[in-house]
């Protein structure tokens, strides 16, 4: 779909726009091209080419220009949809309700701006907010009919996903049946996140290292990749977990239960039905200042959680108010993600040094241009063994994607081979 020259051009344009943000009409199309390319690499090729924060900055630039020049908004703009493309491994199915993205915030000022917009949309200053962890995994949609789990699907492009029902049934934390009938519900669609416990992930990487395989970069990639394995028993062996965080649709035979009047109430109800929900970590607040204080405090505790989180999600608690506020084609107006400091960045591979251990084992160590990630400046990264170097196809001079998650040591996720100029040297 994209030639090497296309990829180099798009990366160069993205780098320029990240340095000097766009402000002119002529840059709208460039931003659309960059974001469409990034989406294709992420959702279709499973190869993210930008750090999350870089992508969000580019997306916000496009949104800013389209707000400034609304007459130039096109139906195929990335802001009009969620993502693109599907794998052909699993059958495609339609979500009952589109799985939209979340708008992102990064600081107190962003949250206060969102609070003002919420009050404008809701027509009142009296808004209760629910705050919960934003788990860093793979999103799924679950359908229960007459109390039985009948379908599970990946997020896909937000409209269509890949059916992974058999694999989802291998996740021990997901009930195969639940008593929705007690509230007169015959069909329900639930949203959740598939994750891997930090200890399970560390053990799995130890097993891979013992087999001479490269460690997986992060739990998110491990969860996403595992869901799409064709062998359900292998899925079972990898010990995935799931956390559900939203009821997107339901069919009632009687009156609506009180538990479905609020977001917090609905997750508390699901928890009592046997579903893993974030009720123990969730908090409800009456002011945005309380929300901001909680966000600041929670970020310092993120590494204490058993699963990786990359932020918090703030939602209007009242379902009635959510319905009144509505949504855009990209995200609900009643929810926003508060993103923690980035733990992923790009750098340049300067050289590889070989260190000899006490037992005589030789470990290759990558030396990179200093880059701050998660509050730490990273300059050296272990490559574990020669097999990892070969598997990742690293070259001196490569631009590399580096990640540091929780207390895990930094990884080189991969080289950005599309940026090679021909001057790089194979290790």
Where are these regions (language model features)?
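RNA/tRNA-interacting regions in translation and RNA-turnover enzymes
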Residues: 1-427
């Amino acid at each position: 779909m994209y030639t090497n020259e296309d990829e180099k051009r798009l990366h160069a344009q993205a780098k320029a726009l990240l340095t000097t943000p766009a402000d002119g009409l002529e840059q709208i199309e460039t931003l659309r091209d960059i974001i469409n390319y990034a989406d294709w690499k992420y959702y279709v090729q499973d190869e993210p080419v930008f750090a999350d924060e870089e992508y969000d900055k580019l997306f916000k630039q496009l949104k800013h220009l389209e707000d400034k020049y609304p007459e130039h908004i096109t139906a195929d703009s990335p802001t009009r949809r969620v993502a693109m493309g599907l794998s052909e491994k699993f059958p495609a199915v339609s979500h009952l309700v589109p799985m939209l993205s979340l708008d992102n915030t990064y600081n107190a000022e962003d949250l206060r701006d969102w609070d003002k917009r919420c009050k404008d949309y809701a027509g009142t200053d009296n808004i209760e907010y629910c705050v919960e962890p934003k788990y860093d995994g793979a999103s799924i949609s679950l359908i229960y009919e007459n109390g039985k789990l009948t379908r599970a699907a990946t997020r896909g492009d937000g409209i269509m996903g890949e059916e992974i029902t058999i694999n989802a049934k291998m996740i021990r934390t997901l009930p195969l049946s639940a008593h929705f009938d007690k509230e007169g519900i015959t069909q329900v669609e639930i949203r959740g996140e598939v994750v891997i416990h930090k200890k399970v992930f560390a053990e799995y990487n130890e097993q891979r290292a013992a087999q001479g395989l490269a460690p997986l970069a992060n739990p998110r990639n491990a969860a996403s990749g595992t869901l799409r394995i064709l062998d359900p028993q292998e899925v079972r062996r990898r010990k995935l977990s799931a956390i559900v965080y939203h009821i997107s649709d339901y069919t009632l035979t009687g009156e609506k239960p009180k538990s479905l009047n609020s977001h917090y109430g609905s997750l508390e109800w699901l928890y009592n039905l046997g579903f893993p929900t974030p009720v123990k970590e969730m908090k409800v607040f009456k002011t945005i200042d309380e929300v901001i204080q909680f966000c600041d405090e929670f970020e310092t505790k993120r590494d204490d959680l058993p699963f990786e989180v990359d932020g918090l999600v703030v939602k209007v608690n009242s379902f009635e108010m959510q319905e009144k506020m509505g949504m855009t084609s990209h995200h609900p107006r009643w929810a926003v993600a508060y993103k923690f400091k980035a733990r992923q960045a790009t750098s340049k591979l300067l050289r590889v040094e070989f260190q000899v251990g006490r037992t005589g084992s030789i470990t290759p160590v990558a030396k990179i241009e200093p880059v701050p990630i998660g509050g730490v400046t990273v300059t050296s990264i272990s490559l574990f063994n020669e097999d990892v170097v070969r598997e990742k196809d690293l070259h001196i001079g490569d631009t590399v994607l580096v990640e540091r998650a929780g207390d895990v040591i930094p990884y080189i996720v991969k080289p950005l081979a599309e940026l090679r100029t021909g001057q790089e040297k194979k290790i």
